[in-house]
Amino acid sequence: MWAVAKTAKDGAGTLRRANFELRNELTVNIPEGAKKVRVWFALPQDNDAAQKVSGLRIEAPYPHRVERDSEGSKVLYLEAQNPKQKDFKVVTTFHVERSEVRTSVDPAKAKPLTDADRARYAKYLQPNKHVEINDEIRTLADQIVGNETNPVIAARKLYDWVLNNVEYWVKDPKNKKASPVGSTTYCLAFRTGNCTDFESLWTSLARAKGIPTQIVYGSFLKPELRGQDQDQSYHCWAEFYAPGLGWLPHDVAVADLYAGEYPVNADNEKLVRLTTADGTFGPDPARVSYYFGNLDERRVVWSRNRDLIMSPKQDGEAVNALPKAYVEVDGKEHPEKTGWVRKLTYREL
C-alpha cells in the first residue's frame, strides 16, 4: 500500500472525509470484421492509504478478470473473440470512502536523500517517454534548486517555479491548449498545458535533482457534476519521497488556478470552475500552500505512473497512462472517442 504521509489532526482540525457511490461505464465500438477485442479498464485502487473501496460489481458481456499492471494497479481485463455486435458496454459500480490527505510538510523533519534511498526508488528517478530528463531539464533544475539538499525545500522551489512560469490552459482557452499526451517538452516550450503536462514537467525537474517522484491518475468528484452521466475527464497529481516524512503529495496543476490574478470571462469561467475539486478558483495563497503536501477528499485514484505494461501484455507499445482505459482491436490500439468512450457518474452519501 502506498502510505502517503497524513495526520489525523493538526492546527486546522480533523481530516475531512467523503463517501461516494460511483458508476464507471465504458462503451467500446467494434469495427466491422474485428476478430479480437481486448480491453483494460481502470479500477478504483485498493493500495492508496486515503481511499477505501468496497462493493465492487462488474457487468460485462464477455469473459473478464482483474489483473494488475506493471505498477501494481488493479485493472479489469476483458477479451472478446469474434464479436458480432456493433458495440458493447462494461460497467463497474462501487463505493469509495475518501479522506483528505494532510501532512506537516515540515522541512525540519526531512532528511537528505542518500544513495541507498535513490537505489531503493530507482525506477521513480528514471525518465518516461514523455517525462524527459535531458541537459536542458538538468540545467533548469540546478538553476531553480541550487545546492539545496533538503527534498522538501527543493520540491517547494520547483513547485513555485512551475506556478510562476506555467499557466493552465483553461485560463486562456482561445490561445492556449494542452498537449495530447502529457509532455515535459511541450509544457516547457509553450509554458502551458493540462494537469498531466504540469506534473510531467515538475516530475522531470524533481527526478533530475534525485527526488523520487510518481504521477497519480484519478478523477475529481466535482459537486457541479454530481449525478451527471458524462465523461467527467480525469485529473492527476504527484507524490515525492522525502526521508523522514515518506511519500508526500502535491497538486501543482490545480494550485495554479489559485495562483495570482487572471481575467475570468465567458470564454474561460466554466472551464476554470470545472477544473478544481469544488468549483472555487481565483487568487488564494492559502490554497496554493495547501496543495503542496495536502490533497482534498473529492477524488478517486485509478492508476499510477506512465509507460505501463498491461497484464496480459498488450500488443502495442507501453501504455502512456491509464486514467480511463486502453483498448486494442486485432493487435492495434483502438483510440478514445472514435473507438471507445467512458462515462463516470457518482452520488455523494
Q: How should these model regions be labeled?
A:
Residues W2-R102:
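Intrinsically disordered, low-complexity N-terminal segments that are enriched in acidic
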Residues E32-A34, P83-F88, T149, R207-K209, ...:
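A short, structured loop/turn motif at beta-sheet edges
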Residues V39, L158, A238:
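Terminal peptide-recognition signature
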Residues R68-S70, K89-W169, K176-T185, A189:
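Acidic low-complexity segments
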Residues A80-E132, F292, D296-R298, R306-L349:
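Secretory-pathway-linked proteins and extracytosolic
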Residues P151-L158, R191-A206:
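Active-site nucleophilic cysteine motif
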Residues N164-K171, A208, L221:
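Conserved helix-loop functional segments at active or binding sites
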Residues D197-Q314:
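Hydrophobic/aromatic-rich core segments of domains that either
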